[in-house]
Each structure stands twice: as C-alpha cells, then as structure tokens.
C-alpha cells in the first residue's frame, strides 16, 4: 500500500517525494518542511508525538506557507495530536485507515468533511464499510446500531482488493463471510458514519 500511494502515485503525477532516512531530529524535520517547500506531509502518529514532545518553539522557528495537507497512518492518532497540528502547523492532522490487503486507503478524514479528532474518518467514495457481529452459530451480520463495537468489514469488490495469500488459500477464504471482507480490526461507527478504532480481533499486526 505504501508503495502504491507513497512511491508510484507521486511518480505518475510528476510529484517530488522527500524521504529523510536519518535519525529523528525535530529541528531538521521542520527545516526540511520549510526549505523544501513541502506541500503534503504524510507521517506516523509516533513521529507526531515525538515532535509534540520536542516542543512547539522549535516548530515556530520556521514558516510553512506551502504546506496544505498533513496526514497520519499506521496506528490510531490521538485527538491531542490533531489539535497540536492545528495550533503549531496551522493545519489539522488527518488520520485514515487501510491494510496491506486493501491495496489503498479505505477510510479517511478527508478535506471535504469535518475532522472528528480520534476517528479514522469515513469510507472513501465507492467503499462500503460496516461493523459486523458473529452469532452463536458463527453467522456474520452487519450491525445497524451506532456506537456498537464489532469487527470492521468491507464489502468485497473494490478495485485493489487482495486476491490471495501466497501458499495459504485457507487463510484467504477465512477473510470473507459472504459479501464481506473481515479486516480483523475491532471498531465502532458513530451516528455520523465516522469509524473509530478499538483494537485487533486477533494477534496479527
């Protein structure tokens, strides 16, 4: 997934990508954002929390007039980090959700909708997501009630859907219950259609 939208997509659009391979250094990161005129910054919650710990004073040494969008992925983004971005960078940080199996982002806080800090966001156009529960017989059914915890599921058939696991057909079959792909992630969906990560249904990361 990171290869798809982190490397291939920028190349197809003629976009310059900047990757800093050195150890974490808050001052250097901010300098790169400012001097290289970064417009879209994609990072991880752990990195954001490290910047928060380094203090806002370092960030305010520079200006970021070209920066227009900041996104985070890899683990749940705490609400405080979203508001830190707004206060220090002048932009909220957008969280999203995907898996290697999905081949791309499925759920996101996009610029078109209000951000709910702490949420993964809403399904992207063309993606149908729901919360499912298993009954005593193991039958999987979607849950209509808001804020009910269950397993996050996607309706099968999106363009980048996985086609199998190498040498493990049984595992692939177990990922599906009828028309639904079972992600293994526990989540809830609120009344506005935003999804909130709860945890893993298994021990796979």
Residue ranges and their predicted role:
Residues 23, 45-46, 75, 79, ...:
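Alpha-helix N-cap/helix-start capping motif
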Residues 1-20, 43:
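Conserved AMP-binding loop of ANL adenylate-forming enzymes
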Residues 144-147, 153-205:
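Conserved ATP-binding/catalytic segment of the ANL
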